[in-house]
Curated annotation (Swiss-Prot):
A component of the bacterial microcompartment (BMC) shell dedicated to ethanolamine degradation. Each homohexamer has a central pore with an opening of up to 9.0 Angstroms. Expression of the eut operon may allow this bacteria to use ethanolamine as a carbon, nitrogen and energy source. The pore probably allows metabolite passage into and out of the BMC. It comes from the Bacteria. Pathway: Amine and polyamine degradation; ethanolamine degradation. It comes from Clostridioides difficile (strain 630) (Peptoclostridium difficile). This is Bacterial microcompartment shell protein EutM.
């Protein structure tokens, strides 16, 4: 069940910082990129799933990378999100 995995989120102002954060997160730890949400006003949130330790390491690396190239707004890890949270997350394609 996907909800057993932690959910990590990084929000940036601008797409470049979000892409840099996503790249750093998947390179830093064994996490799966869930997707991105463009919230409006230039805010972009990138999300990853994995075990708690991996997601924490990934968001730390992603936040540092985003700060180097853009504006970091927020970083948050939910250790065990309720399964109903999956309904509002982007769907992961099986490509």
């Amino acid at each position: 069940m996907a909800s057993a995995n932690a959910l990590g989120m990084i929000e940036t102002k601008g797409l470049v910082g979000a892409i840099e954060a996503a790249d750093a997160m998947v390179k830093a730890a064994n996490v799966q990129l869930v997707g991105k949400e463009q919230v409006g006003g230039g805010l972009v949130t990138v999300m990853v799933r994995g075990d708690v330790g991996a997601v924490k390491a990934a968001t730390d690396a992603g936040a540092a990378a985003a700060e180097r190239v853009g504006e970091l707004i927020s970083v948050h890890v939910i250790p065990r999100p309720h399964f109903e949270v999956d309904a509002i997350l982007p769907k992961v394609s099986a490509e």
